[in-house]
């Protein structure tokens, strides 16, 4: 069970979890540590101005998109995105175990009560110390996070099995050894904390203080607290919401947001998730067994390499001694090469042993932790963490299956010495390759008839030469950054076809492929030049739009079912080049003021475009228009829209500007400057307006000529 200890320690304080709570990202943290890493945000970032709460966050943040990309937008334009809504950037520190920790928002309260129950500063933000995802707390503060009763039970059992000394639960820094436990408060104290937080006077004088060992026994014998609903603290969980994947109480079903969701019996889902976790553990257990056998094989390889090295050196010395008069100078050079090869092989094998040992220890720890979790009889507590554990188990199992259990180095020295040449040819004496049975694979051939580009995606296909007899274990596809920069790996695997998304529009990329096996890698294929689409073709995105938006015409036409303004985004984001699209007004009743422009992916969807700091827009009625960003209105311009009007939006990253047009005439000055980052086309409207999107358009001639003059 020693490997499991990593699963039981808080990433902030490095000690065993004390009163752990579950963050929305499924990671755990001590209640006291959660309070210490709270950060108070400015009023402009308050929950009223952002779609975030203690139990919910917005989908993405454009800063996180750039930071979490496989490669930055400036470098290549393709990558993998994801993350919580970020809090404002805050200087970070390093905790003892190397995770990111924000500075305390305020001094910890000096009270004998649980720190998480004290008041939380208004507009507080907390960042997960493991995945660095952030969210803003609602009025409930830390009480909005469920407590991990299952983890508490596992820690109690682990500490009992280790007979570990009980620590004080209120020490601000390194916890000292506890000297007493209050049976009423259920808290362990050291002497200084007891005198400061639990003085023997007033109501506390009636509390019973017992030795820590006796307190541990009484705590173990007392029934464990049942997990309660975070929204209704007096109610126990009674059902499981299938849509939200969380236990809920009966009040949530009758009054809360789960009233229209599908629910199932708590006990049935508890058994189902236990069964799923057990099945996942079976597969991971097999991988762990294979890993142990693989480590034995690697350790044997070290001995074999040592023996083969000695044998090879002896053979080399014997051959050199026969030609000693002519080979003295050459012998030293050859021995140096053998030693270098020897050290290289050992280094590769030892590095792989170290890597596999760490991975196996982590896998074993996860397995032991999961087995302990399965022993728990708290259905709601188990269901709070089961989905995350199942995903972790599957992910760990997949990681073992990606060529991890294959030696990276052979034990043989693929060298031999040819001593047949005459003495006058000694200066040409060198090692020759003898292991012709294991050559590298042949160079792959790109199948040009199957390679193509569509919009900002590229599909490439390749194959081995028809007469090749050496099998390839996999392929490595490389692309440059679209600006003639260095090549970077974008795919490694056994497939012979790959589609790369997220490239820049109107850009030229170079692609090449090579094959590999245990012996090494092949030569690169011929370089293929790929040209992405000059203009962007896209539609509106139903997945990110407000639920009141109504789509038609293959998602090119939108209107709304509400009298309030609702936001819809385009499916394609831009960060480079010049892009132009138009929207025609199909219906315009009662003089509303729709807004057109660009926005980040996490823009607010239930207010007019431009009300928050994630959108840059022009809103217009039948007489005039305004530019708006972060609820700031500028540049009132005469001239409005009617049914049949055309609104043009021009996003120019070369000049870092955003410009608007109405009926082919520029509306006002340049709307916004210094435009940088990842932007999505955006519209806000109500039920009185219907618009149709037109894409794949060239930049207007009058703008191009004006730009060339400038």
Curated annotation (Swiss-Prot):
Its EC number is 2.3.2.27. GO terms for molecular function: ubiquitin protein ligase activity; zinc ion binding. A zinc finger (RING-type) spans 10-50. CDD domains: Bbox1_TRIM9_C-I, Bbox2_TRIM9_C-I, FN3, RING-HC_TRIM9, SPRY_PRY_TRIM67_9. Residues 440-535 form the Fibronectin type-III domain. The gene is TRIM9. Residues 374-432 form the COS domain. It catalyses: S-ubiquitinyl-[E2 ubiquitin-conjugating enzyme]-L-cysteine + [acceptor protein]-L-lysine = [E2 ubiquitin-conjugating enzyme]-L-cysteine + N(6)-ubiquitinyl-[acceptor protein]-L-lysine. A zinc finger (B box-type) spans 163-212, 224-266. It comes from the Eukaryota. Interacts with SNAP25. The keyword Cytoplasm applies. The modification Phosphoserine is found at residues 44, 46, 49, 53. GO terms for cellular component: cytoplasm; cytoskeleton; dendrite; synaptic vesicle. This is E3 ubiquitin-protein ligase TRIM9. Pathway: Protein modification; protein ubiquitination. It is found in: Cytoplasm; Cell projection, Dendrite; Cytoplasmic vesicle, Secretory vesicle, Synaptic vesicle; Synapse. E3 ubiquitin-protein ligase which ubiquitinates itself in cooperation with an E2 enzyme UBE2D2/UBC4 and serves as a targeting signal for proteasomal degradation. May play a role in regulation of neuronal functions. May act as a regulator of synaptic vesicle exocytosis by controlling the availability of SNAP25 for the SNARE complex formation. Keywords: Cell projection, Coiled coil, Cytoplasm, Cytoplasmic vesicle, Cytoskeleton, Metal-binding, Phosphoprotein, Repeat, Synapse, Transferase, Ubl conjugation, Ubl conjugation pathway, Zinc, Zinc-finger.
């Amino acid at each position: 069970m020693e490997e499991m200890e990593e699963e039981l320690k808080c990433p902030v304080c490095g000690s065993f979890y004390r009163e752990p709570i579950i963050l929305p990202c499924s990671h755990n943290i001590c209640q006291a540590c959660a309070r210490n890493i709270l950060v108070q945000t400015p009023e402009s970032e308050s929950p009223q101005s952002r779609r975030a709460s203690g139990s919910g966050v917005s989908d993405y943040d454009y800063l996180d998109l750039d930071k979490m990309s496989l490669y930055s937008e400036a470098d290549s334009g393709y990558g993998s995105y994801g993350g919580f809504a970020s809090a404002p950037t805050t200087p970070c520190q390093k905790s003892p175990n190397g995770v990111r920790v924000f500075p305390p928002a305020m001094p910890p309260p000096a009270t004998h009560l649980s720190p998480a129950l004290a008041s939380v500063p208004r507009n507080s933000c907390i960042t997960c110390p493991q995945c660095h995802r952030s969210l803003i707390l609602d009025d409930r503060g830390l009480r909005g996070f469920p407590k991990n009763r299952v983890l508490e039970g596992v820690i109690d059992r682990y500490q009992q099995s280790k007979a570990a000394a009980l620590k004080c639960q209120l020490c601000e820094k390194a916890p000292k050894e506890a000297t007493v436990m209050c049976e009423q408060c259920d808290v362990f104290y050291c002497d200084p904390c007891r005198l400061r937080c639990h003085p023997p006077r007033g109501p506390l004088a009636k509390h019973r203080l017992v030795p820590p060992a006796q307190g541990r026994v009484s705590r173990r014998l007392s029934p464990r607290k049942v997990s309660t609903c975070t929204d209704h603290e007096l109610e126990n969980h009674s059902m499981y919401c299938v849509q939200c994947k969380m236990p809920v109480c009966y009040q949530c079903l009758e009054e809360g947001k789960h009233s229209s969701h599908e629910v199932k019996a708590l006990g049935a889902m508890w058994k189902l998730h236990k069964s799923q976790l057990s099945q996942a553990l079976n597969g991971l257990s097999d991988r762990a067994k294979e890993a142990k056998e693989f480590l034995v094989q690697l350790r044997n390889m070290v001995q074999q390499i040592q023996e083969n090295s000695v044998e090879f050196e002896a053979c080399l010395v014997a051959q050199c001694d026969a030609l000693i008069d002519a080979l003295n100078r050459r012998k030293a050079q050859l021995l140096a090469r053998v030693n270098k090869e020897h050290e290289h092989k050992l280094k590769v094998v030892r590095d792989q042993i170290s890597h596999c040992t760490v991975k196996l220890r982590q896998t074993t720890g996860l397995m032991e932790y999961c087995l302990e979790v399965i022993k728990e009889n708290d259905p709601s507590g188990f269901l709070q963490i089961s989905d995350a554990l199942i995903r972790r188990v599957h992910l760990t199992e997949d990681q073992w299956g990606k060529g991890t259990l294959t030696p990276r180095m052979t034990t043989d020295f693929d060298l031999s010495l040819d001593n047949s040449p005459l003495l006058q040819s000694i200066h040409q004496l060198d090692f020759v390759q003898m292991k012709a049975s294991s050559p590298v694979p042949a160079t792959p051939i790109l199948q040009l008839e199957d390679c193509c580009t569509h919009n900002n995606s590229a599909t490439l296909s390749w194959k081995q030469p028809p007469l090749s007899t050496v099998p390839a274990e996999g392929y490595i596809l490389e692309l440059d950054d679209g600006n003639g920069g260095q090549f970077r790996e974008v795919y490694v695997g056994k497939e012979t076809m790959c589609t790369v998304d997220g490239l820049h529009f109107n850009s030229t990329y170079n692609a090449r492929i090579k094959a590999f096996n245990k012996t090494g890698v092949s030569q690169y294929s011929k370089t293929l030049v790929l040209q992405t689409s000059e203009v962007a073709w896209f539609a509106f995105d139903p997945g990110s739009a407000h639920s009141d938006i109504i789509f038609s015409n293959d998602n090119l036409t939108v209107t709304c079912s509400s009298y309030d303004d609702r936001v819809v985004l385009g499916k394609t984001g831009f960060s480079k080049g010049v892009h132009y699209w138009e929207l025609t007004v199909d219906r315009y009743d009662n003089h509303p003021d729709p807004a057109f422009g660009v926005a980040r992916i996490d823009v607010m969807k239930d207010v007019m475009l431009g009300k928050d700091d994630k959108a840059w827009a022009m809103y217009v009625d039948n007489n005039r228009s305004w530019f708006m960003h972060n609820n700031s209105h500028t540049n009132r311009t005469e001239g409005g829209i009617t049914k049949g009007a055309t609104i043009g939006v021009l996003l120019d990253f070369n000049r870092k500007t955003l410009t608007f047009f109405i009926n082919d005439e520029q509306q006002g000055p340049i709307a916004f400057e210094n435009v940088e980052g990842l932007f999505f086309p955006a519209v806000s409207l109500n039920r009185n307006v219907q618009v149709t999107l037109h894409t794949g358009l060239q930049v207007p001639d009058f703008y191009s000529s004006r730009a060339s003059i400038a």
